[in-house]
Curated annotation (Swiss-Prot):
GO terms for cellular component: small ribosomal subunit
Protein name according to UniProt: Small ribosomal subunit protein uS7
InterPro entries: Ribosomal_uS7, Ribosomal_uS7_bac/org-type, Ribosomal_uS7_CS, Ribosomal_uS7_dom, Ribosomal_uS7_dom_sf
Quaternary structure and interacting proteins, as annotated: Part of the 30S ribosomal subunit. Contacts proteins S9 and S11.
PANTHER family per UniProt: RIBOSOMAL PROTEIN S7
Keyword tRNA-binding: yes
Function of the molecule: One of the primary rRNA binding proteins, it binds directly to 16S rRNA where it nucleates assembly of the head domain of the 30S subunit. Is located at the subunit interface close to the decoding center, probably blocks exit of the E-site tRNA.
One Pfam family, short name: Ribosomal_S7
Keywords, ordered alphabetically: Ribonucleoprotein, Ribosomal protein, RNA-binding, rRNA-binding, tRNA-binding
Gene: rpsG
GO molecular function, one term: structural constituent of ribosome
Similarity comment text for this entry: Belongs to the universal ribosomal protein uS7 family.
Keyword rRNA-binding: yes
One GO-annotated biological process of the protein: translation
Amino acid sequence: MPRKGHVAKPEVLPDPIYNSKLVTSLINHLMLDGKRGTASKILYQALDQIKEQTGNDPIEVFEQAMENIKPALEVKARRIGGSNYQVPIEVRPDRQRTLALRWLVQYARLRGEHTMVERLSGEIIDASNNTGASIKKKEDTLRMAEANRAFAHYRW
């Protein structure tokens, strides 16, 4: 925690091709070892593949996938009287976007296709159709929050 007040988050610049900040954020989440060129090449090829497979605008498909993945609730561990409770809390919009991007990349990497381009495009298409592993992760998170609704009064 900073002693000198609030530290502003750095501004994310929109990407040069689609002019979207969301695409830049996905590139940043895809990037390994600082290789931005490789990550952006993978993403742009995946978006081209989405356009071929669906016939729709790839940015619209990606944004629909993000809306479907974003969690509304999550649980947070809270220690009260020697016991740990999983307390359901609402997720802030910036954290919703971060979790959605993280889950999208995480479950794309676990898919069985040969190249990362195929994996990423497949996961984005599945998420836009409300299927896929990242949607299952969101539903599991929501189910966990619903199961622990009895502890909601411990919110802080």
